[in-house]
Regions:
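Membrane topogenic helices and adjacent juxtamembrane segments
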Residues: 1-36
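Long, hydrophobic alpha-helical segments
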Residues: 44-64
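Selective transmembrane-helix segments that form parts of the transport pathway or gating/packing helices
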Residues: 11-22, 82-104
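Hydrophobic/aromatic residues in alpha-helical transmembrane segments
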Residues: 59, 63-66, 148-151, 216-220
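Terminal transmembrane helical anchor/hairpin motif
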Residues: 101-137, 158-234
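Helix-loop-helix units of permease transmembrane domains in multi-pass membrane transporters
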Residues: 4, 63-89
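Secretory targeting signals
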Residues: 28-49, 90-159
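Aromatic-anchored segments of alpha-helical transmembrane domains
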Residues: 23-28, 92-96, 170-183
Length: 234
């Protein structure tokens, strides 16, 4: 099987430039709050929420954009499945590394200005200098969201409207993974508390990520292994 250098490289470059732009925006927001308001928590802790939706979008794009391209250029569905799995396995820690840098830069800014840095909810880490735990937490998070995106997208690609049925297990994957890293908050725009009551620990997080990766991509493979190539409607 060929290493997905182009697939992975393209997504990494886009993510890098998107992160640089996002870093500038969040830094300006942080300075604005610190100067004209009251800053007593980490801004990046809140900003992370958008990055996981970005990961979901990348997972969706892996199927909607790259699967037809691979098949049209003579590669098998098995080759695509392998390259997508490798891409997720490397892209998730890459995104996590960008967040590690973000927290370190935020810590430096807070230290220079005398602002108070604190977390608003439970995490695997308690300080911005706990690099290994920050890296682990967000790698686990990105694995869950990337896998959920690939799974849902494959279902919609194959069954179109029938792909709605895949949303429930995809949400379950995300909630399961998030629960092991301390994020037991409800889904956006839902007032009920939905999730799993799991222990917050490095071991639980790793096991959850591995489980989500294997189960989610296994189900994805069952969907795409003989999926027909769809023509895009212009």
């Amino acid at each position: 099987m060929r290493f997905p250098s182009r697939l992975l490289g393209a997504n990494m470059w886009v993510a890098l430039f998107a992160w640089l732009a996002y870093l500038v925006v969040i830094t300006l927001v942080t300075v604005g709050i610190g100067v004209w308001g009251e800053l007593n928590e980490s801004v990046w802790e809140k900003a992370v929420q958008l990055t996981r939706w970005y990961a979901l979008f990348v997972g969706v794009a892996l199927v909607t954009e790259f699967l037809p391209l691979f098949i049209a250029h003579g590669q098998s569905r098995r080759q695509f499945g392998f390259q997508a799995a490798v891409t997720i396995a490397i892209f998730a820690p890459f995104l996590s590394a960008l967040l590690v840098i973000s927290f370190l830069l935020e810590s430096l800014l807070y230290g220079l200005t005398g602002w108070t840095w604190a977390l608003g909810q439970a995490h695997l880490f308690s300080a911005p200098t706990q690099v290994p735990m920050i890296f682990l937490e967000y790698t686990v998070m990105f694995v869950g969201w990337l896998v959920a995106g690939v799974f849902v997208s494959s279902a919609f690609y194959r069954w179109q409207g029938g792909g709605l049925l895949a949303i429930v297990p995809a949400v379950a994957i995300v909630l399961f993974v998030q629960a092991t890293i301390g994020d037991k908050a409800p889904l956006p725009f839902i007032s009920l508390r939905i999730g799993f009551d799991l222990a917050d620990s490095a071991l639980s997080a790793v096991l959850a990520a591995v489980g989500a990766f294997v189960v989610g991509l296994g189900l994805t493979w069952l969907i795409i292994r003989d999926v027909p190539l769809r023509n895009k409607v212009s």
